Amino acid sequence: MSIPDSSVVKAFLLELQNNICNGLEALDGVASFKEDSWKREEGGGGQSRVLTGGKVFEQAGVNFSHVMGASMPASATAHRPELAGRNFEAMGVSLVIHPNNPHIPTTHANVRFFIAHKEGTDPIWWFGGGFDLTPYYPYLEDVVSWHQSAKALCEPFGDETYPKYKKWCDEYFWLPHRNETRGVGGLFFDDLNKQGFDKSFDFMQAVGNGFLTAYAPIVERRKETEYGEHERQFQLYRRGRYVEFNLVYDRGTLFGLQTGGRTESILMSMPPLVRWEYAYIPEAGSPEAALYSDYLKPRDWLSL
């Protein structure tokens, strides 16, 4: 088995952050990212980049972080008790994009690497990540192209890879209290290490590099679509689901807060504007109703 090398992972993640920021700036055409570098007292730090007030993107955040500590937090050891008593190193790129136009979906992506050491034993390490799409208005073409891109990047890694990580994504981004998915899914993987460092790293890179390939065509198709106050209000209402998931269920958010991570960077995923409405029910036969009935549940999008 190849030896895990965190330095090559870090170099890739920094390059990925640059590439994604450059790609998003090109899509927006007006706004640019502002960088905020930070250090963590217990060890490590990161670079938070945020674009606000763009022509296409209301807010887009692309974070790189590399943190270390003497012991793993409860959020990490809960499902991996063998990590207790080990020092750790965690690094990743995480992004969330909230567009202005309700016809462009919100999206999230993350790729990460963990390694935990204890003197006299082999390190415990794994990769994780994925990307997912949260549309406000139902465009089957966009959802299918998103999943086609996800499947294509998985194909070199085996026929079972896409269905496995697609299913995991549907299960992870589920809001039990709403009985609905956060969006239309994509890929989600974690604890990836069984095939050795090199192959696992290859897959993580494929997911990171595949994100813009999947998302950019959707932005291009929808960015000139006209919308009014009704669509905007529905977008703001549905953004509430994003807030609910991230603050109640998301493991990455919990890990960051429990490890004393930088709060501004962790909560960068929050939409700049959001609204809740008591007992909202979409009008029968409307596009909003179609989102609820046809899109907020796990489906095999590539067989429709």
From Swiss-Prot:
Residues 242-277 are annotated as: Important for dimerization. Substrate binds at S94, N110, V111, R112, G260, G261, R262. A divalent metal cation binds at H98, H108, H147, H177. Pfam families: Coprogen_oxidas (PF01218). Its EC number is 1.3.3.3. GO terms for molecular function: coproporphyrinogen oxidase activity; metal ion binding; protein homodimerization activity. It catalyses: coproporphyrinogen III + O2 + 2 H(+) = protoporphyrinogen IX + 2 CO2 + 2 H2O. Pathway: Porphyrin-containing compound metabolism; protoporphyrin-IX biosynthesis; protoporphyrinogen-IX from coproporphyrinogen-III (O2 route): step 1/1. It is found in: Cytoplasm. PROSITE patterns: COPROGEN_OXIDASE (PS01021). It is an enzyme of class 1 (oxidoreductase). GO terms for biological process: protoporphyrinogen IX biosynthetic process. Keywords: Cytoplasm, Heme biosynthesis, Metal-binding, Oxidoreductase, Porphyrin biosynthesis. Its main location: cytoplasm. One of its GO terms (cellular component) is cytoplasm. Belongs to the aerobic coproporphyrinogen-III oxidase family. Homodimer. This is Oxygen-dependent coproporphyrinogen-III oxidase. It comes from Shewanella piezotolerans (strain WP3 / JCM 13877).
